[in-house]
Amino acid sequence: MKRLLFVIAILLIGKIHAQENVFLTNEYWKQKPSVAQVEQAINQGNSATAFNSRAFDATTLAILNGAPYETITYLIDLEGNGVDKLTHDKRTYLFWAAYQDNVPVMEYLLKKGAKVNITESHQLTPLLFAAVGGRSNNAIYELLLKHGANLKDTNADGANALLLLLPHLKDLKEADYFVKKGLKLTATDNKGNNAIYYAATTGNRPIIEALMKKKINVKNLNNKGESAIFGAARGAKRNYNKLDTFLYLEQLGLSLNQKNKDGLSPLFVLAEKNKDEKVINYFLEKGNDANQLDKEGNNPLMKSAISNNISVI
């Protein structure tokens, strides 16, 4: 019993220490601390190499919050960090620097031998991670390619950097760099999703319209028989589309009640993530069946109960 209490006490002390570590808070790094200030905090007992509960460390948070270059490079060089240290989702510092469009820090890491052809837990390389983050600065990609990255790399779904970047672009001209490098606007991923499907995930009308002018098929169906409506229904990682996006796609001739090869309508996808009641109601009005079942016997209500809010349920 005493041994158990001792172990619990040690764990609690460690947890309290982690909670008190100023380096593991975004607020500290938003103040843009200097090297001298970081050294002072270290001398006060804060660890510049420890992780928080999500495997973010001081260097990662410094990069994500735009800390000064000198501060970030100081942290990188501390014993216990280094260019190959794995952080959240098995990402090295090069991933975070590319994601934040921090070319100077990328250059520093690459000079220190940072690897460019590695993948994190979601099978993204630093180059693909920058694209997923919507980074259109060509200097990021030029630097990575110069150090051996492959622009033709794809994620686990077979999507290349161009497809991953398209949802975030404001002007299709921003894609010219990738097209000149050999990537094609006509590309599809392993699931058969085309460029317009990807643009639809963020409801990116300017890009959808520009792609249609390039003869990209707005009515393309993927391997599961799904149109861009399903892409819009799935949305982006942290965002969902509003009703105006679906009204726009409907005006382009896409059916809101189109079923995929499993017999499921877009409502089945919407119920899991989209929190806009107007969207849900509109799809119901368009004939989407609230009682449809997937192969596991789940219906839209069950899907919404797992991850959506009470108003949608």
PLM features per residue range, with description:
Residues 40-47, 73-81, 107-115, 142-150, ...:
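Ankyrin repeat domain, specifically the short helix-to-loop turn at the C-terminus of the second helix
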Residues 16-45:
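Sec-dependent signal peptide cleavage junction
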Residues 31-33, 61-68, 96-102, 129-137, ...:
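Ankyrin repeat A-helix N-terminal signature
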Residues 1-23:
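Bacterial Sec-dependent N-terminal signal peptides
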Residues 57-107:
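Mid-chain, structured segments of secreted extracytoplasmic proteins
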Residues 20-29, 50-63, 85-95, 119-131, ...:
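Ankyrin-repeat boundary/"N-cap" motif
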Residues 134-254:
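Solenoidal tandem-repeat scaffolds enriched in leucines and small polar residues
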Residues 221-313:
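Eukaryotic tandem repeat interaction scaffolds
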